[in-house]
């Protein structure tokens, strides 16, 4: 089995069975407080929560964010996630496909995932560091073709790699490779972080490189410094990982920086979004979709029904936030008054 697959198993164990969240840093949504509207002038049951992203219509503005792409026992989790995404009418991004390209038997990603995610967008996923490989363009297209993806996530995770044993430490030329890949791949390309956030400055570089969308994947949820520290055997790196446990830009700050510069850029908010009220705040700050990974993972270990129940609760809370602000739809929510 590939070493990357072993590491993914450790990641899964860390997130499921240990506290890997940031200690004191939040996603920043507590700074957004809606003004209550006592005359909403809309029907609670008719509030429209539908959304559109990269040409696909969704029943709800939710994304099952990338996770469990390489663990050998993860296929059942991914199948449940795909089934739930189809039932709820939401998008799904798979975890890193680096392992599936090297060892398809232990990838956690069967080709049936496309059949299970019926009628909803499915997003492929590769690490930006792998774009430095000689076969990078072929690998990217293979990743897309392997699951018949509707778009390709490329994840930026330099700090995570820095804490990994045998991680990819040379990031010179990554931006140029992103620009070149955009010209070669035949689906939209979304750039995401993994929980440290994308700043307005980096977003500008990515937009100029031609990317189609950005997932800010900000700080406030799972700390990948902590996760990699858990996987480390080197004492110095373990201590450093704990020191950097709260490193990153809060998700709300990322949204404010990027949406202020690019009013029309498709944006995903993920990182420390735990409930429908926080999802409403993310939409208010400019997110077109709201992604969750760790918050969904425990439900995914139980059943498809548990995942569906999770997103039904999220949808109820989002609907309540819309109604409480007098917002008949998500577009109106972006203009809701704040205290």
UniProtKB/Swiss-Prot annotation:
Alphabetical UniProt keywords? Cytoplasm, Flavoprotein, FMN, Isomerase, Isoprene biosynthesis, Magnesium, Metal-binding, NADP
Q: Which family does it belong to?
A: Belongs to the IPP isomerase type 2 family.
The record ties this protein, via Pfam families, to: FMN_dh (PF01070)
| EC assignment | 5.3.3.2
- Subunit structure comment from the entry: Homooctamer. Dimer of tetramers.
Q: Which reaction does it catalyse?
A: isopentenyl diphosphate = dimethylallyl diphosphate
Q: Which GO cellular component terms are attached? A: cytoplasm
What is the protein named? Isopentenyl-diphosphate delta-isomerase
Main EC class of this protein? Answer: isomerase
Q: Where in the cell is it found?
A: Cytoplasm
UniProt: substrate binding residues: 7-8, 96-98, 160
As cofactor, the record names:
FMN; NADPH; Mg(2+)
Stated role: Involved in the biosynthesis of isoprenoids. Catalyzes the 1,3-allylic rearrangement of the homoallylic substrate isopentenyl (IPP) to its allylic isomer, dimethylallyl diphosphate (DMAPP).
What is the organism of origin for this protein? Vibrio campbellii (strain ATCC BAA-1116)
């Amino acid at each position: 089995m590939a070493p990357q697959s072993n590491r993914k198993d450790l990641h899964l164990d860390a997130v499921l069975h240990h506290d890997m969240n940031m200690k004191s840093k939040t996603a920043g949504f507590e700074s957004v407080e809606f003004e209550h509207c006592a005359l909403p002038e809309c029907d609670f049951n008719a509030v429209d929560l539908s959304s559109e992203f990269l040409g696909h219509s969704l029943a709800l503005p939710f994304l099952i964010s990338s996770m469990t792409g390489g663990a050998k026992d993860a296929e059942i989790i991914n199948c449940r996630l795909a089934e739930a995404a189809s039932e709820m009418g939401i998008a799904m991004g798979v975890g890193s496909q680096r392992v599936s390209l090297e060892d398809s038997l232990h990838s956690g990603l069967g080709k049936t995932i496309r059949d299970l995610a019926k009628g909803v967008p499915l997003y492929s996923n590769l690490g930006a560091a792998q774009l430095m490989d000689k076969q990078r363009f072929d690998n990217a297209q293979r990743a897309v073709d392997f699951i018949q993806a509707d778009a390709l996530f490329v994840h930026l995770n330099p700090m995570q790699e820095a804490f990994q044993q045998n991680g990819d430490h040379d990031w010179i030329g990554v931006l140029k490779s992103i620009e070149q890949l955009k010209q070669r791949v035949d689906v939209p390309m979304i750039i995401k972080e993994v929980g440290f956030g994308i700043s307005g400055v980096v977003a500008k570089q990515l937009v100029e490189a031609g990317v189609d969308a950005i997932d800010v994947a900000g700080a406030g949820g799972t700390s990948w410094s902590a996760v990699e520290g858990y996987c480390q055997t080197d004492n110095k790196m373990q201590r450093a990982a704990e020191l950097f446990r709260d490193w990153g830009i809060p998700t709300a700050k990322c949204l404010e920086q990027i949406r202020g510069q690019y009013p029309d850029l498709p944006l995903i908010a993920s990182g420390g979004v735990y409930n429908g009220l926080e999802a409403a705040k993310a939409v208010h700050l400019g997110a077109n979709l709201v992604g969750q990974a760790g918050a969904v993972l425990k439900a995914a270990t139980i059943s498809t029904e548990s995942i569906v129940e999770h997103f039904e609760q999220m949808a109820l809370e989002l609907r309540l936030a819309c109604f409480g602000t007098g917002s008949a739809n998500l577009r109106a929510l972006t203009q809701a008054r704040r205290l």
